[in-house]
Swiss-Prot record:
It holds the Pfam family Beta-lactamase. Gene3D superfamilies: DD-peptidase/beta-lactamase superfamily. Belongs to the class-A beta-lactamase family. Changing residue 60 to A/H/Q/R/S: Abolishes the catalytic activity. The keyword Hydrolase applies. The active site is at 57 (nucleophile), 60 (proton acceptor), 170 (proton acceptor). It comes from Penicillium rubens (strain ATCC 28089 / DSM 1075 / NRRL 1951 / Wisconsin 54-1255). Keywords: Hydrolase. This is Lovastatin esterase. InterPro entries: Beta-lactam-related, Beta-lactam/transpept-like, Diverse_Enzym_Activities. The gene is PcEST. It comes from the Eukaryota.
Length: 399
């Protein structure tokens, strides 16, 4: 990992990296910051472990925890109808195609959307950039791009890609779940996360886009001459339009946090210490939650050209499903992930995992240089995923 990361720094492909990993007991701890970051002024500083990182889709895990806390509070249920809480979701039809004159064809939803569907990407809500039909509909009917920033329900106005519960496609389900949390709690998603997730773990340095706290901006990796708006462009591969166009908390992609703090959340789930959720609720996160139809659709997505992105480092031969919070391995991988390891990431540059069977969790955040070399980022993330197990194994051999 060290030599591979340094080689990428030396060739100018990345600026640095932050890696944090631990076992449940905190006996094995590996925290390392490599390289340097550039300040908005152009000045360079060594990468620090407490630098504030853009989580992008790694936000989804934290939003999942918040939603499950609302389930524990009796405010929501995993399989309940969300129509009264999110009528905008209930009003969505399923896009089935277009007529010869390009008018959309759609069917009414056969069943209500549930929280579990939102958390597992089986609700039918898809990102437009992953579904050509939704992209086509959006180009014709969605709100003009240059209007004022939008809330979740204003940005994701497009129809469903498939009948709720019958398919799988990556999408804004966690953004909707975050709004559902806000509506049942009567506050902002950030307020709820701070009180119920961050405060119990001693986390004080987090904010949804835009980061306005000056103490955080001083440590914000993504505030630099290449990204003066701190959109997280180097994490998501350029642009940053979703942050720029959004207003309010987007539970699918909007959080900024340090690597040290993110691994606190991973460790709490790994240890199942009751700090965030009751043990049974954490156990439930590490179960396959896709029904037969959605699981078949998930397998098709994994075999598609987008499959490498959706597999987050697992081999095509490895049996996987989808838990509450990320991809779930359904079998052991020799020398690496144990069965029921939960894993996902953020953009092109960040990845995390929780392996309860082998008692290890970690996050690796590569600080890319624009334009982002996606293939190299995939290789570097994979180096982290495997080398951290080698380091853990070597440590255990010395105990």
């Amino acid at each position: 990992m060290d030599t591979t990361f340094q080689a990428a720094i030396d060739t100018g492909k990345i600026n640095g990296a932050v890696v944090c990993a631990t076992d449940a007991q905190g006996h094995f701890v590996y925290n390392k910051a490599t390289g340097e970051r550039t300040l908005l002024s152009g000045e360079k500083q060594p990468q620090q472990l407490d630098d504030v990182l853009y989580l992008a889709s790694a936000t989804k895990l934290i939003t999942t925890i918040a939603a499950l806390q609302c389930v524990e509070d009796g405010l929501l249920s995993l399989d309940g109808d969300l129509s009264s809480i999110a009528p905008e979701l209930a009003a969505k039809y399923v896009l089935t195609g277009f007529t010869d004159d390009e008018s959309p064809l759609d069917d009414p939803p056969a069943r209500p959307i549930t929280l579990k569907m939102l958390l597992t990407h089986s609700s039918g809500t898809s990102y437009h950039f992953l579904d050509p039909s939704i992209a086509k509909w959006r180009a014709q009917y969605a709100n003009p791009e240059n209007e004022k920033p939008r809330l979740v329900e204003e940005m994701f106005t497009y129809p469903l890609s498939f009948q709720p519960g019958t398919g799988w496609m990556y999408g804004p389900g966690l953004d909707w779940a975050g709004r559902v949390v806000e509506r049942v709690t009567g506050g902002t998603l950030m307020e709820f996360m701070q009180k119920r997730i961050f405060d119990p773990l001693g986390i004080t340095d987090s904010q949804f886009y835009p980061v306005t706290r000056e103490d955080l901006r001083a440590r914000l990796v993504d505030l630099n001459p290449s990204d003066p708006g701190a959109l997280g462009s180097a994490v998501i591969g350029g642009g940053g339009e979703m942050n720029l166009r959004g207003r309010g908390a987007f539970g699918g992609h909007g959080l900024f946090l340090t690597g040290l703090d993110f691994v606190k959340i991973l460790r709490s789930l790994l240890a199942n210490d009751g700090m965030l959720l009751k043990p049974a609720a954490v156990d439930n996160m590490f179960q396959q939650h896709l029904g037969p139809e959605a699981a078949a659709s998930h397998r098709a997505a994994l075999a598609s050209p987008l499959g490498p992105f959706f597999r987050v480092g697992t081999d095509p031969e490895t049996k996987v499903g989808y838990g509450l919070g990320g991809l779930l391995t359904l079998e052991d991988v020799d020398g690496w992930y144990g069965e029921r390891t939960l894993t996902w990431g953020g953009g092109l540059t960040l990845t995390w995992f929780i392996d309860r069977k082998n008692n290890l969790c970690g996050v690796g955040a590569i600080q890319a240089v624009l334009p982002v070399d996606g293939d190299l980022m995939a290789d570097l993330k994979q180096t982290f995923r495997h080398d951290i197990y080698r380091k853990y194994s070597a440590w255990k051999g010395q105990q």
